[in-house]
């Protein structure tokens, strides 16, 4: 069976990082490599063929965009998508105003059709309007804001198989 790749991205920060407040950064420690906080949520059912891309691996790296990450073979997300002749991506996750935004803007910059699943994202909102502003910026860059039922219609056929996109 010919699968389109499913790529799951994650923050995978070292214990000591300039990304964290303790290292002069903006954020409390989170998603420290090999910790429970860096694990995918137990309700996220990832198929066996899922490609995992980790970002924020280096002590001096923020790793906001998934396009800054690599898989276990040291392959960048851009190279993974290109190798599979992927033309479009669906983006969801945390946080709308940081990682989602950076990933979507990079996806558009690299020429990918980009869908943002608005009922599967959540902002940090350091300022009350950050999430809304990020959504506008992504839309202005050409991303399509959709809900999860639209993704289902776009990519899954009635028989459960996936549409080629």
Which residue ranges define each predicted feature?
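Active-site alpha/beta core segments
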Residues: 1-88
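Structural recognition of alpha->loop->beta junctions
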Residues: 33, 37-51, 128-160, 165
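Short, charged, surface-exposed secondary-structure boundary motifs
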Residues: 63, 125-128
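A short glycine-rich beta-strand->turn/loop micro-motif centered on a GG-aromatic cluster
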Residues: 90-93, 113-125
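Histidine-anchored nucleotide/phosphate-binding helix
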Residues: 98-111
């Amino acid at each position: 069976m010919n699968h389109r790749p499913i790529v799951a991205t994650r923050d995978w920060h070292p214990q000591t990082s300039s990304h964290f407040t303790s290292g002069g950064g903006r954020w409390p420690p989170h998603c420290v490599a090999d910790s429970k906080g860096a694990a995918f949520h137990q309700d996220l059912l990832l198929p066996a063929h899922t490609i995992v891309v980790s970002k924020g691996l280096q002590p001096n790296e923020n790793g906001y965009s998934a396009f800054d990450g690599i898989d276990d073979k040291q392959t960048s997300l851009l190279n993974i998508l290109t190798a599979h002749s992927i033309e479009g991506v669906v983006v969801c996750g945390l946080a709308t105003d940081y990682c989602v935004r950076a990933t979507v803007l990079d996806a558009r910059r690299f020429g990918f059709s980009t869908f943002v699943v608005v009922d599967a994202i959540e902002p940090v909102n350091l300022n009350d309007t950050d999430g809304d502003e990020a959504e506008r910026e992504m839309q202005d860059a050409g991303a399509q804001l959709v809900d999860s039922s639209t993704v289902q219609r776009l990519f899954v056929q009635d028989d459960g198989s996936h549409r080629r996109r």
